Amino acid sequence: LNSSTTVFNYNKDAFRKAGLDPEKPPQTWPEVVLAAAKLKAAGVSCPFTTSWQGWTQLESFSTWHNTEFATKGNGFGGTSARLNFNSPLHVRHIENLANMAKQGLFVYRGRGNAADAPFYSGECAMATASSSTYATIKKNAKFDFGIAPLPYYPDVAGAPQNTVIGGASLWVMAGKKPDEYKGVAAFFNYLTNAEIQAKSHQRTGYLPITMASFEATEKSGFYKQNPGTDVAVNQMIRKTTDKSRGIRLGNFVQIRAIEDEELEQVWAGKKTAKEALDSAVKRGNELLVRFEAANK
């Protein structure tokens, strides 16, 4: 029920000081580079950063560009799927980020959501992150901020496509008493109530999980009163393809850890983008081979 997707947050006050239009965030990755350079020239020590680097820069990046992350429809076609995020487009993107890092335009702040706090503290001016950062930014930021769609490469056919969902799930375990299941059902019914979901979405930035809660939010005027809060929804409701409808792979938590390890080698200047992505794909595919063998 805490479902989110990836968005682009930016500091409008920092944009103003750098001579950038606060109502025109960068739409493409080349524009991100130009904006970052102007922000750095204006004295910003961390022009751009990212949280959840594997999710934002590889997984959502892939679906946003309608490009395979893995074969077999990103794993939906069976356990024989293999990773494919070392394509020329992926390598180009990570190379660009590495070049930004060398110039001080991209500053890596750590795994997971470690880059969230440097954004809402005002240290970092632009960040790719979860849409669920909305509540924390609104509560903590002492500056005017904006939410925009993920940047894309304009020369890639079909981009932008759609982003992928992230978050967590609630599971009901077997072996409990009937009365306990009645309580679980009542709780789930409460959580999925359109009014409750709409309020949660508006408060947190997590996605509304039903059309009724989305429509209630839209009807209330919330999106017009809070520009950018509909970005996550609009990125998700675009038409999907077999390359963009999501990712389903075995041992995915371990694969994400490999992504982090290899990308960190790039940011540290110890590997090229191609070396790191080739290694990540090779190591990840070894896990997928084991998963396939264990689930035949």
Where are the language model's segments positioned?
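Conserved C-terminal helix/tail region of periplasmic/extracytoplasmic solute-binding proteins
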Residues: 16, 22, 235-296
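C-terminal lobe and pocket-closing loops
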Residues: 131-143, 153-258, 293-296
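Short helices/loops that flank or line small-molecule/ion binding pockets
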Residues: 14-15, 33-39, 100, 113-127, ...
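A structural signal for short loop-to-beta-strand junctions that line the ligand-binding cleft
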Residues: 1-15, 46-47, 157-163, 242-248
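Glycine-centered hinge/linker elements that transmit conformational signals in sensory
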Residues: 33-39, 78-109
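Extracytoplasmic/periplasmic substrate-binding proteins
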Residues: 57-60, 67, 91-183
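Short glycine- and hydrophobic/aromatic-rich loop-to-beta-strand nucleating segment
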Residues: 6-10, 62, 170-172
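Extracytoplasmic/periplasmic solute-binding protein
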Residues: 1, 6, 30-82, 124
